[in-house]
């Protein structure tokens, strides 16, 4: 079960747009002519989307949470950039969005793991390929699930700011899926639940390559952060760029 309303106020603090992220995407933009067309899946409150649009890039953000899409839409009213937000599931992307239109599609902050069905995950890779322009790039950022292979319960890296911290854990549930539990602890010690045994799919590097190849992707690059440091199975995070 999800309690997204408990995280909206703190979302930008827990998932800040960093200079490293900006540099990462600035390098990607060099491969395409302006305006670069971005599709951001699981855009949250839209902070990164507005940062991407500062140079005139065309940015579309998708979000399934009504609370987060409301926050993103409110941000749009105060900033004059070429950004649009839609409350839309990945299941419906190809029905409503332009095929072959986007230069870069991103799904960050482990949002892809909430597609907790192998068939629907494969569909995600096929659909993203359909929406990408020729030589377009798909960017994924998620927890490195090689950390979960041995333990029944795995603690994820803590996210924190001055006001709040998020504590997350993954628990095996006896199937191919796992349970994600997340709590927020505020500065005064109050505990707010965000995820309670929410089912997620432990997507690995090997499956990303397999699903990607099936969908027509041929080039895969893996890093352990947006700094583009070399990925290893011991990395906390997995960043993938594929074409």
Residue ranges and their predicted role:
Residues 103-119:
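A short SAM/SAH-binding and catalytic strip from SAM-dependent methyltransferases
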Residues 95-105:
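A short acidic, Gly/Pro-enriched loop at the edge of an enzyme's catalytic core
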Residues 205-243:
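C-terminal lobe and adjacent flexible extensions of AdoMet/dcAdoMet transferase-like proteins
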Residues 47-93:
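Class I SAM-dependent methyltransferase SAM/SAH-binding core
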Residues 1-44:
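Conserved class I S-adenosyl-L-methionine
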Residues 122-134:
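A short glycine-rich, Lys/Arg-flanked "PGG" loop and its adjoining helix->strand segment in the class I
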Residues 139-209:
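SAM-dependent methyltransferase
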């Amino acid at each position: 079960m999800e309690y997204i309303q408990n995280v909206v106020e703190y979302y930008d603090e827990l998932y800040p747009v960093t200079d490293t992220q900006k540099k990462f995407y600035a390098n990607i933009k060099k491969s395409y002519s302006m305006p670069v067309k971005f599709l951001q899946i699981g855009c949250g409150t839209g902070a990164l989307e507005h940062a991407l649009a500062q140079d005139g890039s065309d940015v579309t953000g998708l979000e399934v949470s009504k609370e987060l899409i409301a926050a993103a839409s409110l941000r749009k009213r105060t900033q004059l950039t070429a950004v649009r937000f839609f409350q839309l599931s990945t299941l419906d992307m190809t029905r409503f969005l332009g095929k072959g239109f986007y230069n870069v599609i991103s799904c960050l902050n482990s949002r892809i793991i909430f597609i907790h069905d192998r068939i629907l995950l494969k569909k995600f890779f096929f659909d993203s390929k359909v929406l990408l322009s020729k030589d377009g790039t798909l960017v994924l950022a998620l927890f490195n699930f090689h950390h979960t292979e041995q333990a029944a319960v795995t603690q994820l890296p803590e996210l924190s700011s001055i006001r709040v911290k998020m504590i997350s854990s993954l628990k095996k549930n006896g199937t191919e899926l796992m349970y994600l539990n997340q709590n927020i602890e505020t500065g005064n010690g109050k505990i707010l639940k965000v995820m309670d045994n929410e089912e997620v799919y432990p997507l690995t590097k090997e499956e990303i390559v397999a699903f990607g190849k099936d969908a027509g992707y041929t080039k895969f690059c893996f890093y352990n952060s947006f700094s583009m440091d070399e990925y290893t199975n011991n990395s906390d995070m997995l960043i993938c760029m594929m074409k």
